[in-house]
């Protein structure tokens, strides 16, 4: 007979360095899954956004580290796309150029995560230029954030955000570079993961509340590995741990070889306490 009420541990291994853990009550109470009132749809949207962002961080931490790169690519007036579809075509043409160059120079396959940020009107084919709207807030001018594996120089990656067919024999000549027809401003930096991995960059990408974001990845990224255990924790133990929410030693003992970097307790009137953990592998 299936257990009616229990505490589930879900481990999410993000590569060799990162581990996320959800410890959540699972109950058969119908009230636990209900949302009431006017704000229920907005609450669900907020939850969906939170889960999408978290999934992005998990995939990024699984596949990228400080040897890899972040590219910000924008559009100038001469090359401003009129639709989201056109912008997506532009950025995928760019990624194809990078893919070919990377294979030729390093022998590696390109790995990437792409975020395109835009205003909702662009989905309908009506571009909203950067400027003041009726709300008095700035519209989001369409642009891209790309995380890619290392191997090519930052200068060459920036050079390829252009309509010019690059002559690589002249590519190091400053005069040649000045004559390149850039699509817009482009900047490439090395990733700088902190104690929470790449989450800081994701927060930067998501800093604007206004506007929409569409993200996609290359097909060759590794997926986080998930393991579930319904017998490791009890409701009583979870209540005990919640009394000392800042105590990291509990989790060091529970997950040996890992250092907790984030601990987040949540309380629900129907199901009780749950906890989310992010841990980093202790380096020798």
Question: Model regions: which residues?
Answer:
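Right-hand nucleic-acid polymerase module
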Residues: 1-140, 150-284
């Amino acid at each position: 007979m299936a257990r009616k009420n229990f505490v589930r541990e879900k481990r999410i291994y993000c590569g060799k360095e990162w581990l996320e853990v959800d410890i959540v009550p699972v109950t058969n109470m119908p009230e636990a899954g209900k949302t009431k009132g006017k704000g229920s749809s907005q609450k669900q949207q907020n939850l969906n956004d939170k889960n999408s962002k978290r999934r992005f961080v998990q995939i990024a931490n699984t596949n990228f580290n400080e040897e890899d790169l972040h590219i910000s690519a924008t559009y100038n007036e001469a090359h401003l796309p009129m639709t989201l579809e056109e912008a997506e075509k532009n950025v995928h043409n760019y990624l194809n150029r990078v893919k070919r160059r990377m294979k030729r120079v390093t022998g590696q396959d390109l790995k990437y995560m792409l975020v395109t940020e835009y205003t909702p009107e662009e989905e309908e084919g009506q571009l909203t230029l950067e400027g003041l709207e009726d709300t008095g807030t700035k519209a989001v001018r369409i642009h891209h954030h790309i995380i890619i594996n290392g191997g090519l120089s930052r200068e060459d990656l920036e050079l390829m955000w252009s309509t010019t067919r690059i002559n690589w024999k002249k590519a190091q000549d400053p005069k040649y570079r000045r004559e390149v027809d850039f699509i817009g401003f482009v900047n490439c930096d090395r990733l700088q993961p902190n104690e929470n991995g790449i989450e800081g960059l994701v927060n930067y990408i998501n800093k604007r509340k206004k506007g929409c974001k569409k993200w996609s990845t290359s097909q060759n990224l590794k997926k986080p590995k998930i393991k579930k255990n319904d017998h490791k924790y009890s409701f009583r133990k979870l209540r005990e741990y919640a009394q000392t929410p800042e105590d990291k030693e509990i989790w060091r003992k529970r997950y040996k070889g890992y250092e907790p970097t984030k601990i987040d307790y949540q309380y629900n009137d129907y199901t009780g306490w749950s906890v989310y953990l992010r841990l980093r592998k202790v380096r020798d």
